[in-house]
Regions:
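A glycine- and small-aliphatic-rich helix-loop capping segment at beta-alpha/alpha-beta transitions
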Residues: 10-22, 45-47, 68-77, 170-175
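Glycine-rich beta-alpha junction loops
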Residues: 59, 109-114, 154-160
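Acidic, glycine-rich active-site loops and adjacent beta-strand->loop/helix elements
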Residues: 5-8, 31-32, 57-63, 111
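Active-site-proximal alpha-helical scaffold in enzymes
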Residues: 28-55, 94
């Protein structure tokens, strides 16, 4: 089992796994945790180290606010650039087999850290744009594909502002239209 959550030490995931008595890896990479877990699980299954792997993710709005921004009890006004962390959870089973199914993980491209010096905790989307653009461009280059090969291109926590910047960044700097 590979799990991720938005709290330090993946404490929510670890508490949930206590009673299951199965191998467990906690993944801490914020909003990328779920997709990172899927890529790692697919690698484990593909290499024959596991027949199946469960990947789970959870988050809680107020816990994320307290850790990343400001405790909600402070009553800080949220600016329009602020993302809204969901309170929710989800899980998938990654499995190999003789016959590939209609949904497959065939490639994974891990991102690199980019730090352009943005410091606003309420505008993390803008701060993540360079890394998101770099990861997408490297993925397209590595796989020899273009954006038309995909039904959807999804990112983590860019929000409305960061998503708009990413679209413009890719179009203006690289001629890539998403």
């Amino acid at each position: 089992t590979l799990t991720t959550d938005l709290l330090n030490q993946c404490v929510s995931s670890s508490f949930a796994m206590r009673s299951l008595k199965v191998p467990h890896v906690g993944i801490f990479c914020a909003c990328a945790g779920f997709v990172c877990g899927m890529a790692l699980a697919a690698s484990l299954v593909d290499a024959g180290f596991a027949r199946r792997a469960v990947v789970g993710a959870s988050s809680h709005h107020d816990a994320a606010e307290r850790q990343y921004r400001f405790p909600t009890e402070l009553g800080v006004q949220r600016p329009p650039t602020a993302q809204w962390t969901v309170t929710g959870a989800g899980a998938v089973v990654i499995a190999g087999g003789e016959t590939p199914g209609p949904i497959q993980i065939t490639h994974a491209t891990f991102g690199r850290v980019w730090d352009l010096g943005l410091k606003d905790p309420y505008d993390m989307g803008s701060a993540m744009v360079p890394a998101a653009a770099d990861t997408l461009l490297r993925h397209l280059n590595d796989t020899g594909r273009n954006v038309d090969a995909y039904d959807w291109i999804l990112t983590g926590d860019l929000g409305r502002v960061g998503s708009r910047i990413l679209i413009d960044w890719l179009k203006d700097r690289h001629g890539v239209h998403i």
